[in-house]
Amino acid sequence: MVGNCQSVPMIGVATGAAIAGAWSDRHRQPPTFPALVCVLGFTETALIPGISAAGQTPSDRQITALADGEFLLRGIQPQYHYALPPLTAGASPALISRALIEALALPLYVFDAGLPLPRLPEMIDLGGTPARCLTTGQAMTPQMVAHLWEQGWSWGAKLSSQYPWLIIAECVVGGTTTALALCESLGIPARDCVGSSHRQSNHTQKWSLVQKGLAHLPPQADPFTCVAAIGDPMQVVVAAMALRASQTCGVLLAGGSQMIAVYAFGRAIAQWRQLPWRPEQIVVGTTRWLIEDQTAQIHRLAERVQCPLIYTQLDFSLSRHPALRAYEQGFVKEGVGAGGCAIAGHLLAGWRNSEMVDIVDRLADRWAKGM
């Protein structure tokens, strides 16, 4: 790890210090408040037993993205259409993101890129479908990939014309496995590097599945062929959105392994289609919990991708909620833009750790009481 961003001590820099520091400085002060965009998707890879801890059962994992999206949009309610599914330990990172969205008053857009169950009315339909399991080598049709790319490109143009910069987040259960597959398909060694919702990353299981999917790929496959074979709908939408938005504004890809894979995919598409690539405009932002996960080593993946990676130093050791303190034991690490929202809080409001913990604790108080 390189160290801290000099102008914002609560932000750490894992890779790409020069670009990361310059990017942080450009987005540090009001009135340059961003919009938060969260793209929800689904891959049937998530139904494989043991593949993810983001929902205890395959049935739970089908609603995880919908529940996280609902909590982002509506916050605490007397009743939920999709209640947050129980985790092995800890609280959904949607709790962090929602608390910080409220405190910063960020505009929010939640997109359905392909979900297995009906979305909420507030979610923007992109006309996608869930991806099949990556082991089939036919996760998405070429037509669906082209459609999702156009949707992402169009929304990237629209949003970048309305906001000075964008935080783009995701929720895809099983998405670190498709991230591993996408990186490998693009020629980037990623085995044993991607994160996991499990306390100890399940690298062996992921690698076995990815090998089955990659076996279907022809030699020298182009990026669209790769993602159609082994990817998920979020990857296509976010890569297009970020690539288009970065022509005119800054982009924070809020996540870990999945967003590093999206960064690599977007760059590969830019090279393949001879589109402008603005690396100074795009950084990946995550959490300290993921950076310090010795079973993942995503900083090594970021180095291989040559992707600037920053992270919040947020620490819940002194939280009054056991579900938040569980983050310090590695039970939950990142998701739904939690790291990116915290980074925005450091940049825009100058919040230190105690202030940010208090903001999240106060929402957790209400959540624990169901009000």
UniProtKB/Swiss-Prot annotation:
**InterPro entries linked to this entry:** Nict_dMeBzImd_PRibTrfase (IPR003200), Nict_dMeBzImd_PRibTrfase_arc (IPR002805), Nict_dMeBzImd_PRibTrfase_sf (IPR036087)
Q: Which organism is it from?
A: Thermosynechococcus vestitus (strain NIES-2133 / IAM M-273 / BP-1)
Protein name (Swiss-Prot/TrEMBL): UPF0284 protein tll2306
Highest taxon of the lineage = Bacteria
Q: Which Pfam families match?
A: DBI_PRT
The entry lists its GO molecular-function terms as: nicotinate-nucleotide-dimethylbenzimidazole phosphoribosyltransferase activity
Upper classification of the source organism reads: Bacteria, Bacillati, Cyanobacteriota, Cyanophyceae, Acaryochloridales
SUPFAM superfamilies referenced in this protein's UniProt entry, alphabetically: Nicotinate mononucleotide:5,6-dimethylbenzimidazole phosphoribosyltransferase (CobT)
Family affiliation: Belongs to the UPF0284 family.
